[in-house]
Structures are given as structure tokens and as C-alpha cells.
Amino acid sequence: MGNDTIANIITSIRNADIVKKKTVRIIATNTTKNVVRILLQEGFIEDAREHREGQKSFSVLTLRYRGRKEKTYITTSKRTSKPGLRIYSNSQKVPKVLGGMGVVILSTSQGIMTDREARRRRIGGEILCYVR
């Protein structure tokens, strides 16, 4: 049985938000690096850097908070396609989150990208998660 790295990212960020932790450490894989790159581009996290301990490589994410109440920019995140149930979408039916306010992260034949980029390139793929 394998690990669901995308669910690990989402859960780690959610748990860090609950305890108001500024940084999160996740295991670095090609998939997690691409998802972190998208979260960084879209402004959901403040910074991401690589950290190495022995043979293992980690990504250290700095969460982005707003206001005095220290609310994170990620209000809701949900894993859509799971290892036991894959969910795919063609290029015409790529979903939008909150009318474009959130981001859908897809895995396509041209790599992991956002819903906007997939619509622009007119390609579909596996819907990995929603972030708003």
C-alpha cells in the first residue's frame, strides 16, 4: 500500500493552520514539488525551500497568514481524486472553484497544473485537489 502524498500535503497544512504553526515540513517527491510550486505561484504559501537530512529530502513550506486573527490564505482544501477512486475531467469540463477564486490542481499529460492553465491549453486530466 502506497502513500498519498497529496493528501499528506493538504493534511499537514490544515494541521499547521489549526495550531497556528508558521512552517510545515513535507517529504519531497516530484509530485509534491509540483503541487508546492502551484501553491506558491497562486499565493497560498509564502515560501518553499528544500531541506535534506541524510538520504531523505524535505520541502519546508512557510504558510501565508493574513490579518491579526492569523487566518491562513488556504480556507478550504479537499483531495478529490484518491488512490482508490480516480476522477478525470476532459478539457471542456474542467471545474472552477468559487467562480475562479480558488484553484483546481490537475495532473495532465503535460504535467501538474492549475485549472486555468489546463483550460488555456485545452487539455484535461486527473483532478487532484481543490484549494480555496
Swiss-Prot record:
An example Gene Ontology biological process: translation
GO molecular function, one term: structural constituent of ribosome
Keyword rRNA-binding: yes
Keywords (A to Z) from UniProt: Chloroplast, Plastid, Ribonucleoprotein, Ribosomal protein, RNA-binding, rRNA-binding
Pfam families per UniProt: Ribosomal_S8
Family according to the record: Belongs to the universal ribosomal protein uS8 family.
UniProt protein name: Small ribosomal subunit protein uS8c
